[in-house]
Amino acid sequence: METSEIIKKVRKIEIKTRGLSSNIFAGQYHSAFKGRGMAFSEVREYQFGDDVRDIDWNVTARFHRPYVKVFEEERELTVMLLIDVSGSLDFGTQKQMKRDMVTEIAATIAFSAIQNNDKIGVVFFSDKIEKYIPRKKGRKHILYIIREMLDFQPESKKTDVRQVLEFLSSVQKRRTTTFILSDFYVRKDFLQSLQIASRKHDMVAIQVYDQRARELPDVGLMRVVDAETGFEQYIDTSSKRLRESYRKYWMDRQTQLMETFNKSNVDNVSIATNEDFVKSLLMLFKQRS
């Protein structure tokens, strides 16, 4: 992709996702993802309605008037985006490819985070750690992340979620709010790794999928290629039995994936590329508020 084309795409994504963050997501994000708790700020004179449990008895005794402690939320969070860059994300039969939607969702979360004074870090992963972008604040940092998502070329096309979860635990010693963005087209079970990570971090899983992964169209002979392994074959989609078998495989796989998230106490949402991700994210944020 040419540099000028990348700049145009970055700007287009910024306009859309920054607007969403400012107008729709900022308040919901703040409510859904809490800070580290309440920290002491100052003392002031007692006012009618103040909680008597907040009275600072030492200061009250010194000045012979009641004073209360004032607390403020320790807001600043570290937000980590674990972004799947494997070969299966370069697929789309509807409005856009899965990678395009993942980029927009990640950018929306990132802008929401910096508007709440949170830091953002990113890990690109396949079946290995492809790139690590340490946490920072600011618009320039977000634009750099978007540019990397648009232009990054991974070394591997395969997926192993375990690798990125183990990496997260090794580089982030303090608690983070972590989003995993992937189609979760995985061949290896990652339940144990997710359970370990979720004990330390506030984990949220966002699955992006294409409608054709859920249901095959009846269009006769079709050439299909596994984007991660390169395996290629022709299938007869006019076979009702084949289509039903394919649909059952999808449903069974989704059931197993949801069980993995539930056993790990990980909030999650699944979004198709032909759906409005704004509605799905808002629903997720509201459920957490």
Annotate each PLM feature.
Residues 1-33, 42, 51, 170-174, ...:
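Von Willebrand factor type A / integrin I
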Residues 1-131, 135, 177-180, 187-188, ...:
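An amphipathic, basic-hydrophobic helix/alpha-beta surface used to engage anionic
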Residues 58, 154-158, 181-182:
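Short, flexible loop segments at the rims of nucleotide/cofactor-binding pockets, characterized by
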Residues 71-72, 95-97, 137-138, 193-195, ...:
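Short, glycine/charged-enriched secondary-structure capping and boundary segments
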Residues 89, 93, 149-153, 265:
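Short amphipathic alpha-helical interaction patches enriched in hydrophobic/aromatic residues
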Residues 103, 107, 158-165, 254:
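Short, well-ordered alpha-helical scaffold segments within catalytic/effector domains
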Residues 132-147, 259, 287:
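Short, electropositive alpha-helical surface patch
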Residues 141-176, 188-190, 210:
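Von Willebrand factor
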